[in-house]
Curated annotation (Swiss-Prot):
It is an enzyme of class 2 (transferase). The lineage of its organism: Bacteria, Pseudomonadati, Pseudomonadota, Gammaproteobacteria, Vibrionales. It catalyses: D-fructose 6-phosphate + L-glutamine = D-glucosamine 6-phosphate + L-glutamate. This is Glutamine--fructose-6-phosphate aminotransferase [isomerizing]. The keyword Aminoacyl-tRNA synthetase does not apply.
Amino acid sequence: MCGIVGAVAQRDVAEILVEGLRRLEYRGYDSAGVAVVDSQSNLTRIRRLGKVQELADAVDQAEVVGGTGIAHTRWATHGEPSEINAHPHQSGDISVVHNGIIENHETLRELLQSRGYVFESQTDTEVIAHLVEWELRTAASLLEAVQKTVKQLEGAYGTVVLDRNDPSRIVVARSGSPIVIGFGVGENFLASDQLALLNVTRRFMYLEEGDVAEITRREVAVYDALGERVEREIAESNAEHDAGDKGQYRHFMQKEIYEQPTALINTMEGRITADSVVTEAIGVNAAEILSKVEHVQIVACGTSYNAGMTARYWFEDIAGVSCDVEIASEFRYRKFVTRPNSLLITLSQSGETADTLAALRLAKEKGYMAAMTICNVAGSSLVRESDFAFMTRAGVEIGVASTKAFTTQLAALLMLVTALGKQQGRISKEKEKEIVEALHALPKQINAALSFEKDIEALATDFADKHHTLFLGRGEFYPIAMEASLKLKEISYIHAEAYAAGELKHGPLALIDADMPVVVVAPSNDLLEKLKSNVEEVRARGGLLYVFADADAGFEGDETMKIITMPHVSEITAAIYYTIPMQLLSYYVALIKGTDVDQPRNLAKAVTVE
């Protein structure tokens, strides 16, 4: 959730650190800071509340010099957003930045106070700085002091330590919070996200759980949780250097909405032919594993959970395999029964979602036949720890509110469902061809849906002064309504809820009045007549209706019901298609309200803590 950047180089690194933080702004933060040391052990620490630009201005004014440094954007967990709670934190000559939550920080704080340490902040991170300073008094090196320190920490952390008396190195430790190391020529770097470093390197190594690494200009030495020197794979990144550029678009979210046709084409490339799904392209041993699956368990959070809920209908309707979907933060804390030959599927854009990662680790202990992930970030923890990974190819997603990651997850899930049904002989060649042809048609159809932008922008004015909104859908369009509701509340701060339309009479109907917009996702399908009855229930009570439907659905609008007529598309991919107008609606409502579309308040892009 926070952002970390570090560098050890011959050149001054302050500009590299600040630029790295700029590239991580999308993750969400409330304050930022840097600590830089030069070859004469002169340390400069600057922290600012607010945007990275305020930190950048202060760094420029101070003319910060030095070839070794660490930087951080903070998203408050312990202690209010303030300059004194901003990172880096210091203890004597030690400076520390940290992502995560130290669960035993209160116990450690009491211990350190008994040793005479005085705390200036309310954060859990400051205990790390004091512990390292204490251990360094007897340790042979900063590396040893950090190794001794992390053994005392409980919880999740990615932490980086700098000693002003040893400006040739920094030490980083990872447990539950991602850290990537970037390799340069005569200089090395680290960050919580490779995007921060794409302007200085393309060669990356991901630390694994329990790793501690010592980074100098010429070497990166990695040690595992037992203190043994280990080698980790170094890989070349193909991520775009200019991924952090909005180009012609006003916001990253708008850009990413428009990138969806290309993202879908990239995700499908090599995975489907003209008339079939290429099972082998889904993952190593996918064909063998899928042939044995009797049950699917999907675990995810947020938008990814909504994708899983949509896919549940597909697994059971198309592949004939039972499927459960659960929120990761609930799944990991309850006792559950593992069904025979169950496949666990985790969904995550970042591959670092803390609850989803913990759920994966728990499930692997509980006898699941196999664990796969559908993920957008190669080399992420979920990808490394799963038995096989089906990578979406959405490209870097900057906006906190997910768009192209969601639709590419849905496309990946539909391909997986088809492969599963195919391997088990549950779908015919004709059905497989129908699904694949619908997928091939989808990018062009989404391009057409984007042409409704101006109409939806005009529609958004009806919502901007409202305090509540309901979204309704049936079948696989209920989770699409859930996703639409999530988008609206995330970026416009309007309270929004989604309901299966059949639940209206069980409570939500009491909310209907002339100030309550009700958005209905209503393509023509076998549930349409049922849905029309629900629409009439809202009309009869004076509700404001906004119905997204194709011409075949046969809705007729009036002063209380606006019809947004969409082109007819295949029922197979309609759930993906109808996501697009919902995204545009949320975007334009937020734009009219003047909220921060790309970095909505209190939210972060990658939720790497509980």
